[in-house]
Amino acid sequence: MTIISDVYAREVLDSRGNPTVEVEVHLESGVMGRALVPSGASTGEYEAVELRDGGDRYMGKGVQKAVDNVNEKIAPELIGENALDQIGIDRLMIELDGTENKGNFGANAILGVSMAVAHAAANALDIPLYVYLGGFNAKQLPVPMMNIINGGEHADNNVDIQEFMVMPVGAESFKEALRMGAEIFHNLKSVLKAKGYNTAVGDEGGFAPNLSSNEEALATIIEAIEKAGYKPGEQVKLAMDVASSELYSKEDGKYHLAGEGKVLSSEEMVSFYEELVSKYPIISIEDGLDENDWEGHKLLTERLGDKVQLVGDDLFVTNTKKLAEGIEKGIGNSILIKVNQIGTLTETFDAIEMAKRAGYTAVISHRSGETEDATIADIAVATNAGQIKTGAPSRTDRVAKYNQLLRIEDELADLAQYNGLKSFYNLSK
């Protein structure tokens, strides 16, 4: 029933028109599982390797090498294996690759297979993916972290901070949270139009206006929240992904906020955040400092770690070794989980488990280059992570995840939980 009969990969396109890997895993029973792999714009230097072809084809971004690795190297080894043995299959692929960073086959090749195997197994058992991955205890719907103003690497504007997000913590259900986010998003469009700003959207569906400062982005979102009829700080909190590694200069060891014409030291960046947190209801800051600025992260954690979720993305890259080091040094209090940063479902789940045991939160995340694949929605519920970051309620590649969560909430019915503010269980103030 669940024995793998074929594994097949093909090159498809992501939401930015760049190639990515799609994998199908076929079982002897005739059941098939399919998965598509995402891709990031701002990437941590310690991420698993995303294999690209180089050359002229697709301007060097082709993934035919990764596709060939699946079809010619991975597939022959997996045929005859049991799709229910997720851990065994993931470990086998890691062993076959033989590198620390999956640079031989490519994390995009390995991840595509890993996710497709899980889909095939769930389909064979005729149960939802979140139930297959999480068991009977998978019932918590995540608070959405909705990116509604884009800057940095995700937009062509003069806003330095990469993402400004809203989190509807005061909702009673995921369905209500999504509605609140969508209403705020549409009101933000009206507010921006009234101010004469562009309402074109960036990679993740949020608006990308040429605002005069990062603080203006926060003030404009507050205006939109109020215009939508909600109370900032009570029903809706703010979150930011600074993606500071993109602002950091190795030459002078400073952070260059070009949009504001400022050059700041690590300590000045921490003070900058303290000022913003004192003025606005910010509950989460991601990658507030460069991925190698551990002293700066330590200072940020000491100053704000009891009242703000400090998320490590480039800092931890969904890697248990990096996370363990951060936990030991008391750096951050949360990890961003991106399946393609590490390259298998098994390692992804290991990172989530390690974070939770240490009292860190885990935020399940998309990438800026996405597809219609909604696997991360199921992962969020399977792990009871409590938070998901998957863009604005705009663009099908983002909305696909939200719609899947609506379906899951419907399926769970009375068992569904939406914890809102309680999802930030490690904040004391």
Curated annotation (Swiss-Prot):
Mg(2+) binds at residues 241, 286, 313. Its cofactor is Mg(2+). It is an enzyme of class 4 (lyase). NCBIfam families: eno. Its EC number is 4.2.1.11. (2R)-2-phosphoglycerate binds at residues 162, 338, 367-368, 389. It catalyses: (2R)-2-phosphoglycerate = phosphoenolpyruvate + H2O. CDD domains: enolase (cd03313). It comes from the Bacteria. Pathway: Carbohydrate degradation; glycolysis; pyruvate from D-glyceraldehyde 3-phosphate: step 4/5. The keyword Nucleotide-binding does not apply. Catalyzes the reversible conversion of 2-phosphoglycerate (2-PG) into phosphoenolpyruvate (PEP). It is essential for the degradation of carbohydrates via glycolysis. Disulfide bonds: none annotated. The gene is eno. GO terms for molecular function: magnesium ion binding; phosphopyruvate hydratase activity. Binds a second Mg(2+) ion via substrate during catalysis. HAMAP family: Enolase. The lineage of its organism: Bacteria, Bacillati, Bacillota, Bacilli, Bacillales. This is Enolase. Its main location: cytoplasm. GO terms for cellular component: cell surface; extracellular region; phosphopyruvate hydratase complex. Keywords: Cytoplasm, Glycolysis, Lyase, Magnesium, Metal-binding, Secreted. It is found in: Cytoplasm; Secreted; Cell surface. The active site is at 204 (proton donor), 338 (proton acceptor). Belongs to the enolase family. One of its GO terms (biological process) is glycolytic process. The keyword Magnesium applies.
